[in-house]
């Protein structure tokens, strides 16, 4: 202890900063490893009868023991309202560059665990090289910002979490619950909340303009997500009406799309989804002023409400199910 104390006292200012940075990143890496270890334990326990507390499996096992009926659970969920509220505070400490690098490290470590199970020595070596590369990147990345974020920056930062987490995981949550309830539809009980750009706790930088910006940016993020999903769905549903039938509603939706491409004239699902995509793109312009990326689009009428989008997608879904397509693009729909 005395030797360490003496060594630390003899450090120059620059050396002390390096030591502090090293320990900071070391703790970050330890946290990533601990999170992944906990995730592995949870995944293992989910495969056993003794499910880990807090998991959906544990919760539904308890429902079974208490002989809860699906109708009771659906009724409670129909009245429930869970709303995680995002604030700027968690995003002010770390830079986006640091968070992105740490996310990449986490993804590499997840792949590493799978490669170990496969005993794939060659790919393990490549994985280790990738891991070292990102750690070097992290070490050479500035940890702190030189200037404070403004409200617009805070809005952009928090929206990154929607893209990386919420938009992917919330549908999985609903699907898992619905499967456990006999594939019955569950009411929308999980709704995101957000203070950024609209909080009224005395922040002098929050105005009606920042609130308007926040609402538009959130809308743009959600609509762009749907645009991407509809585009991917169109690439998956390459169904020819010469080979399988389609509902009259689906054929009408395809006709209304006015798709000029002759190569898709026998593919009503793609035509219908092009129409849905075009209307979503028009909605994006109307509500946010932003434009959809790429893809030549015919002029379309914007959607007036979310129910109209859902209705069109239901036409695609119902036709798919009625014409031997239950296994087609089920997850995405």
Identify the residue ranges that each predicted region occupies.
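Often metal-dependent polyanion-binding catalytic scaffolds in large enzymes
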Residues: 1-333
């Amino acid at each position: 202890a005395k030797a360490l104390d003496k060594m630390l006292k003899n450090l120059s200012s620059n050396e002390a900063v390096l030591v502090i940075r090293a320990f900071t990143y070391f703790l970050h890496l330890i946290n990533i490893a601990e999170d992944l270890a906990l995730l592995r334990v949870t995944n293992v326990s989910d495969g056993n009868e003794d499910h880990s507390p807090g998991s959906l499996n544990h919760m539904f096992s308890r429902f079974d023991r208490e002989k809860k009926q699906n109708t009771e659970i659906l009724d409670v969920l129909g009245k429930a309202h869970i709303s995680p509220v995002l604030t700027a505070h968690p995003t002010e400490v770390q830079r986006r560059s640091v968070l992105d690098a740490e996310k990449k490290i986490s993804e590499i470590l997840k792949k590493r665990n799978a490669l170990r199970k496969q005993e794939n020595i060659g790919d393990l070596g490549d994985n280790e090289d990738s891991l070292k590369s990102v750690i070097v990147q992290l070490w050479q990345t500035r940890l702190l910002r030189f200037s404070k974020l403004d409200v617009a920056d805070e809005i952009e930062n928090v929206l990154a979490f929607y893209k990386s987490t919420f938009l992917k995981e919330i549908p999985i949550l609903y699907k898992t619950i619905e499967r456990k309830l006999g594939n019955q539809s569950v009411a929308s009980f999980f709704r995101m909340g957000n203070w950024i750009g609209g909080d009224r706790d005395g922040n002098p930088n929050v105005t009606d303009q920042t609130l308007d910006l926040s609402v538009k940016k959130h809308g743009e993020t959600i609509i762009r997500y749907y645009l991407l999903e509809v585009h991917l769905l169109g690439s998956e549903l390459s169904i020819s009406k010469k080979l399988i039938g389609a509902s009259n509603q689906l054929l009408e939706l395809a006709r209304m799309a006015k798709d000029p491409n002759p190569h898709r004239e026998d593919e009503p699902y793609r035509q219908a989804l092009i129409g849905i995509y075009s209307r979503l793109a028009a909605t994006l312009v109307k509500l946010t002023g932003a434009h959809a990326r790429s893809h030549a689009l015919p002029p379309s009428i914007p959607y007036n409400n979310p129910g109209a989008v859902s209705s069109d997608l239901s036409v695609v879904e119902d036709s798919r199910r009625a014409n031997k397509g239950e296994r087609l693009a089920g997850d995405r729909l």
